[in-house]
Amino acid sequence: MTTPSAELPALARIRDDVRAMQAYVVADATGYLKMDAMENPFGLPPALQAALGQRLGQLALNRYPGTRQNDLKAALAAYAGAPAGSAVLLGNGSDELISLVALACARAQATVLAPVPGFVMYAMSAQLQGLGFVGVPLTADFELDEAAMLAAIAQHRPAITFLAYPNNPTATLWDEAVVQRIIDAAGAQGGIVVMDEAYQPFASRSWIERMRAQPERNGHVLLMRTLSKFGLAGVRLGYMIGPAALVAEVDKVRPPYNVSVLNTEAALFALEHADVFAAQADELRAARTELLAALRAMPGIERVWDSQANMVLVRVPDAARAYEGMKARKVLVKNVSTMHPLLAGCLRLTVGSSADNAQMLTALQASL
């Protein structure tokens, strides 16, 4: 006889905080226009798709990943313009890298700090690894509250400070001088700063330029990127660049063979054709300009924030109603209005192709 899961004695062995959590569920989006996950709408051109398939088909899948990953690390370092003396760490998506940094720093009473609202994985990884989390609210315009950030760093002395550059879900790219002062303050008390550049293909600048120009001020900075927004969300490949000594310590808690031979080869193939993905990013930036203008001209939209990513944050009179109305019209967006008080009334819209954006705008207008 099977014991109902709610009565399983073994459940008592699961941590209380884990049992209180909700598992991440990907809803079935069949038949919907997906504008909720900041995915690149463009696939590979057919010729490249065929070439990639042929290349992957030649891999020895019966063998564990080997030194081919060193080729990928070198290619990523060259592509990103990694500073001298840096190293690259690969992850199964940037989510794994966030968890690895948290795990490497998981001492008693250690703290993670980040601006909020921000990427939810910073707080979740801290919780799962037993670190405290301190969220410092942004201003009403979703800019960094420099005084509050500096005060929080002085008070909590965080082991890790996460700065998303640009931020998710606000799509803001914060002032360089303010960011540098926060990095300086975190470093002055011995902390690590992780610059999360998941949306770098759509931003006007990268922190890696500062890391090259001022290595002495950024020697405690780890810069993290992903190929998801590059156009390979299905591949799950993140990478982290930073001082070799620091990267080597985080690498010690990485599971062996965490990145598959398929992911490695697909990433190398993508970098060999970086011009294709750069052209797609150019097209999306142009589409973003058009989308921002259309949203600002739309009656009923209360506010539209500037964007340095492939998403746009808007405030509407009733976010839940607008979300459900768009869903009924087969368009999925992200209702972020309950994620943080500063996001009240807000929806996060993915920047898609011109045709996708037009369909999304029509659904939004009809749902306000």
UniProtKB/Swiss-Prot annotation:
GO terms classed as biological process: L-histidine biosynthetic process
Keyword ATP-binding: no
Pathway: Amino-acid biosynthesis; L-histidine biosynthesis; L-histidine from 5-phospho-alpha-D-ribose 1-diphosphate: step 7/9
Class of this enzyme: transferase
Keywords: Amino-acid biosynthesis, Aminotransferase, Histidine biosynthesis, Pyridoxal phosphate, Transferase
N6-(pyridoxal phosphate)lysine: residues bearing it: 229
GO function term, MF aspect, one: histidinol-phosphate transaminase activity
Pfam families: Aminotran_1_2 (PF00155)
Catalytic activity: L-histidinol phosphate + 2-oxoglutarate = 3-(imidazol-4-yl)-2-oxopropyl phosphate + L-glutamate
EC number: 2.6.1.9
NCBIfam families linked: hisC (TIGR01141)
Protein name stated in the entry: Histidinol-phosphate aminotransferase
Organism expressing this protein natively: Acidovorax sp. (strain JS42)
